[in-house]
């Protein structure tokens, strides 16, 4: 999962509760890459107070790897629930419920100064037979209101401001909040796929 790690399923032997464990490799990373990992963990931790953000439970640091223990969502991501399982097809009430949860999570993140920058169905996890959606993967998140980062995120869900051509990039900045708002509209379109 992601550029720096893989995700495993683990079960707490004392409580029998399943968790997802994201293993972030530290070996061979440049300082800049390690800084990105630390930022991802920090911002996810701050945002996980919201019920529609995947809870970050614990961080365990080893010499070669950082293990991030997060809430386990066995139903997978929104993308597979839409495209493979057809869970939302023709169910306007379920679509509305799910989309409002995503909006609420993103608005909460914005209210505490976090901008996700990679909103897409693959980064929204689903529980409760599709009734609950939770924002995940803060690998590209930032606290910068305006950023000069263009082209970060996933191409199919990228706002026009983030996908500008090279000569446009030199002349203007990209408002992080507005990019997330445009992408929310694209997420809504995915429900009708």
Where are these regions (language model features)?
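Conserved N-lobe ATP-binding subsite of Hanks-type protein kinase domains
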Residues: 6
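Catalytic-loop of the protein kinase fold
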Residues: 110-126
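Activation segment signature within eukaryotic-like protein kinase domains
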Residues: 98-99
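A conserved loop-to-beta-strand element in the N-lobe of protein kinase catalytic cores
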Residues: 54, 63-71, 79-80
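A short, aromatic-enriched beta-strand patch in the conserved N-lobe beta-sheet
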Residues: 58-59
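AlphaC helix of the protein kinase catalytic domain
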Residues: 79-89
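Conserved N-lobe beta3->alphaC-helix segment of eukaryotic protein kinase catalytic domains
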Residues: 18, 24-48
């Amino acid at each position: 999962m992601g550029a720096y790690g893989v995700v495993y399923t683990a079960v707490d032997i004392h409580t029998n509760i399943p968790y997802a464990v994201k293993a972030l490799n530290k070996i061979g990373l440049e300082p800049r890459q390690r800084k990105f990992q630390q930022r991802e963990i920090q911002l996810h931790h701050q945002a996980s107070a919201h019920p529609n953000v995947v809870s970050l439970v614990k961080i365990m640091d080893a010499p070669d790897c950082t293990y991030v223990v997060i809430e386990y969502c066995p139903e997978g991501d929104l993308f597979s629930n839409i495209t493979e399982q057809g869970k939302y097809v023709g169910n306007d009430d379920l679509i509305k419920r799910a989309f409002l949860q995503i909006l609420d999570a993103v608005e909460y993140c914005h209210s505490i100064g976090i901008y996700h920058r990679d909103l897409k169905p693959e980064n929204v996890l689903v529980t409760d037979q599709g009734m609950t959606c939770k924002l995940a993967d803060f690998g590209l998140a930032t606290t910068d209101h305006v950023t000069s980062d263009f082209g970060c995120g996933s191409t199919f869900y990228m706002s026009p401001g983030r996908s500008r051509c090279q000569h446009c990039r030199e002349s203007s900045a990209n408002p992080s909040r507005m990019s997330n708002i445009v992408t929310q509209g694209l997420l809504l379109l995915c429900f009708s796929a």
